[in-house]
């Protein structure tokens, strides 16, 4: 592994869909350096894309979108957040029944919603599918 465990990589971009590709690319780069298989890297990229899209649709006009990546034992933890305050209910009440929830759940090994400093965030953990439990 080329990325030390528990080292954070943080990227902040303007909160516009045109910049989400930067977050996906950085996530793929960090994941590749943790020796995740290509399919797992693709899953992480798609999860970052979906999480970013959901946060951008909150409609609170956040100025920035931030991705924090951390190499963990056997995978990568990613937290995507927007600046500003969360909606009255976070996650939105119907989110667990949505296609976005199903997509994020299928692409990640762990999925949670957070409110660091009162700002909405989506946390995704992707572990290596090639890792042996023996």
Segments from the language model and where they lie:
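Conserved beta-strand-loop-beta-strand hairpin that lines the nucleotide-binding pocket
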Residues: 1-10, 54-134
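Generic secondary-structure microfeatures
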Residues: 15, 48-52, 82-84
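Conserved ATP-binding N-box helix of the HATPase_c
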Residues: 37-62
């Amino acid at each position: 592994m080329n990325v030390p465990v528990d080292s954070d990589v943080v990227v902040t971009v303007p909160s516009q869909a045109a910049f989400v590709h930067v977050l996906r690319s950085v996530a793929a780069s960090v994941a590749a350096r943790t020796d995740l298989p290509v399919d797992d890297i693709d899953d992480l990229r798609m999860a970052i894309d979906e999480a970013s899209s959901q946060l951008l649709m909150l409609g609170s006009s956040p100025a920035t979108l931030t991705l924090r990546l951390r190499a963990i034992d056997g995978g990568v933890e990613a937290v995507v957040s927007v600046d500003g305050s969360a909606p009255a209910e976070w996650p939105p009440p119907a989110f667990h029944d949505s296609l976005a929830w199903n997509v994020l759940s299928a692409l990640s090994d762990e999925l949670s919603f957070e409110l660091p400093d009162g700002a909405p965030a989506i946390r995704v953990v992707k572990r290596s599918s090639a890792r042996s439990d023996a």
